[in-house]
Structures are given as C-alpha cells and as structure tokens.
C-alpha cells in the first residue's frame, strides 16, 4: 500500500484560543481547512485518512473512502471532531496527490499548500518573520518517520529551540515566532531530527488580514526555478526568499523572463552561508538594496518566470515565493528543483465560477527541449471542458486563466487537471483567486510531479 503523508493545519476552535508546543499562543485567526485528493492512476483508489492530535492519539476512527480512476474528491468540512488541531496521514492503494486550503475567520484570509509524499531528517525554512510590518509566522513540524521524533530548530539569528518532548508518530508540533524571544524582523531556520526520524513542515505567514502558507524544504537545488513572478501587475508584487544552506557565501544571479508582460532582466546578490536574501521585490519597485545589482527597471509591469542562472560557489539553495497585493491578498509557493521535474504535473484543485473563485495555471518548461504542453481536466457533470495546448521553448512559461472571458467562460467547474509535455520537463503552480475586495482570497499551491 502506498501512503501520502502531509501536514494539515486545522483549527476549529473558538476565537482567542491558540496552538503551540508550550504555553505560548500561535495564529492570528480561527481556522478551518479542506482536503482535496486526486487519484493519479486509472484504477479505483481505496484511501484511509488518519487524523492525529498533537499528542499522537487519533482524533476519530480512521476514515475510509474510495476515489474513482483518475478522479478527485474534496473533504469539506473535514471528518474530524470540532476543535481538532493536528495533522493527517493519508494511505492509498494507488498513487495520489493532495492539496489543503486553510481558511481564517470565516474566509477573511485564506492560504493553500500541497501534501508531502516523503519526509526528511533536515528541513530548510527560508522565510520567517516577527513583527515585520505587521507579519508574523508560525510553523508545524510533523513526524513522518517510524518512531518518536526528537527535534532541534536552529534560527539564522543564532538562537535555537530544542523541545524536551518528542513528536509522536504521525503527529505535529507548533512553533510560534511571535512568542519566541530575540528574533529579527526577517530570518530563516533549519529543523533537524536529532534521532534520525523523518520530518515534514508547513509554514504560515500572516498579518491580521492576510495569510500565506508554504512547505519546508527537504531537498536543495543549485538553480531553483519559479514559474510565476508578478510585478506592478494590477497591484500585485512578488518577493523571492532564497536561502543558502551551504558552508560558504555565493553570488546568486536570478534571471527574469517575461511570458505576458515585461522585459528580461537580472538581479545579483551575495548570500552568506546559512542566510537568506530577498529577490524580485526591491528591483521591480525601483529601490535596489545596498550590495544588489540589477538590470530590471523599477515600476515596469512584469508577468513571467524566474530562474537562478548563476550560483558562483555552487552552494545548495532553496527558494520561497510570496505574491501579494498590498493589504488585500497574499499567497506563497515553493520554488522548484528542475532536476526533479518530470514530463507531467498534477493539479488537484482547479475552479471556475465557484462562488466567485477561479484559478490560473502557471507552467514553465524547465527542460532542454522545445515541447508541446497539453492540459486535460476531469469532467464536471456532463459539461465538456476544453483541452489547453501550448508549445514552449526551454525556460519559457505560460499562464492559463480559468475565468469568465478566458478558457472556461462562464462554466462552473470544480475538479482537477493533469498537464503533459512529452520530451521535456515541466513545473507549475496554481493561483486560486476570489472576487472579494475586502477579504484575502488569493491561495497558491505547487503542481505535483508524480513519482514514477
């Protein structure tokens, strides 16, 4: 039996209560969550969902269900007790993929992240915040191993946290940066298992109005790629946080390539060992930081992709991307290692005309050959859905909108998609966007490259 383990942050408690690994509080909202599971095989999947409390006990009897061949299923509300705060492990007889949406204060703020199909003994967290223009972070670490996990969190400011109690198998532990002492406004972290157990992590960034979520990194890359960068685009901006997990400083050049708007340009910074630096945000705003060199023109509109094209000391890097629109919307995603990309990518949640929500598929060819990309969609009732096709050169990106006036018109759709590009490798992210002008209705997640 194959299994898919992932952290699912679920708070169904009354306003004012928090979550933590100690007596500290965490979280600016009261939270609810949904789970979207996609069956990747042409056979019926029998799945079992285990809901673990933070003490390692199961919250409810394991939930068994089936998903049809190449089909998908949404769990909302989730089948756990009211007030559940913990994590989830999904077991399946077929290969599956999953994405979770987090909703704060009755949908006033929203975020999204994908499941983890494996754990690591060491995780990198490139962006944490404490009191940064109203933003703080907290993160959950889940035990994906086979026994109790003892862990240590080392922050880039030189501080560390070593909990006395272990994380029980399948369970998660919360770390709240707002409640921890002596942090700068922006920093990073390394999470390690001190007894060799496998871990996974999800980070939540939030103000009192906006929420972002991304996963901790277990693997690094010399040249991370980012399939969607927005700058000065209807108020949207992007910040990329690149972390150097190596032993020496390295000069990192990021090359920006337009897909819809803008001109190709570059940005160069030196990232010390164990530190992280912010890219994209300042050069496109026209306020480059000291020590930064760039050919990007501030104030110009840009929609495209980005790639690390120079890493002078060949150090291991990870990249996390934040997209935001002032104090209204925000969403985050993990940058990709192109060497782990494949010819197909799975997108477990695609929407159009769904209570005002629609999605966009943002895809990048990270291989060395020009190829034709085709995206197909699971049926929604008897409504026929278009197949999207585009030929992309190496390092070229494309954005497809599932919205009124675009590919789907006014057709309501809630389902999933699979994109294929024979002869090359692709990566993708999905933006979910609602129509509200007062609530944070931007959610972003990474497309999943299935394991062969």
Regions found by a protein language model. Give the residues of each.
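Gly/Pro-rich, tryptophan- and cysteine-flecked surface segments typical
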Residues: 20-452
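Sec-dependent, cleavable N-terminal signal peptides
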Residues: 1-26
